[in-house]
Regions:
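A short, charge-rich alpha-helical start-of-domain segment used by transcription regulators
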Residues: 3-8, 12-38, 48-51, 62
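Acidic, proline/glycine-rich intrinsically disordered inter-domain spacer in sigma factors
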Residues: 15, 100-130
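C-terminal flanking helix
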Residues: 33, 58, 133, 137, ...
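Short, small-hydrophobic-rich alpha-helical interface motif
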Residues: 36, 40, 50-61, 153, ...
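Σ70-family region 2.3-2.4 aromatic/basic alpha-helix that recognizes the −10 promoter
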Residues: 51-64, 70-106, 172
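DNA-recognition helix of helix-turn-helix
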Residues: 83, 151, 157-186
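A short pre-motif secondary-structure segment
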Residues: 139-143
Length: 186
């Protein structure tokens, strides 16, 4: 598959500033693209579609790059755009969030079987993960499925590392409680 090239930021800035902003954009996208592709692939279950979603995210980010640099956390802004693009793609392709999450986690769990050996598919772990509150879901997936470091997750979520650790801990507790409840029902 041929990858589209990213446009250069269009600026009304002096050439030196424009060049710096171009370099910052390109460096940011190059360093972020592998994670964006993996995250999108995780949700839609198809790497090629994940790449298209990630590139669309880069194009959208490019449109607001100056504003993002001036006012916001680029990692958080990019993650927001990426998640919006995933939702749009799922709607366009008639894939429900639960179905995409289930397929994605099934693939991710198989790939990291040893890490998740204690979780049994029959106990509805995929459903439980997909039903976590948004912030817990994001932190859990980034850490345990995609293997991101705490500092990287904190930048993407625009929170402290302590908040990331706490959020992941809360997600684990919620999952354990859900799985325990299902076990009692069986």
């Amino acid at each position: 598959m041929s990858r589209p090239s990213l446009p250069e930021p269009a600026l009304n800035a002096p050439p030196q500033v424009s060049a710096y902003i171009d370099q910052a954009f390109n460096a940011f996208v190059q360093s972020s693209m592998p994670l964006w592709v993996r995250f999108a692939d995780l949700h839609v279950g198809d790497r090629e579609s994940g790449e298209l979603i990630a590139f669309e995210t880069a194009f959208q980010l490019h449109e607001h790059w100056e504003h993002v640099l001036a006012h916001g956390n680029p990692h958080q802004h990019a993650m927001t755009l990426l998640r919006s693009e995933i939702v749009r793609w799922c709607a366009e392709h008639a894939i429900t969030d639960a179905m995409a999450a289930h397929a994605a986690f099934l693939r991710a769990m198989r790939a990291t079987k040893r890490q998740f050996a204690v979780l049994d598919e029959s106990h509805g772990v995929y459903t439980a993960i997909s039903k976590l509150p948004d912030r817990q879901y994001l932190a859990f997936v980034l850490r345990h499925v995609l293997g991101c470091e705490t500092a990287q997750i904190a930048r993407m979520m625009n929170v402290s590392e302590a908040t990331v650790n706490s959020t992941v801990h809360q997600a684990r507790r919620r999952l354990a409680a859900h799985l325990d409840q299902i076990e009692k029902e069986d």
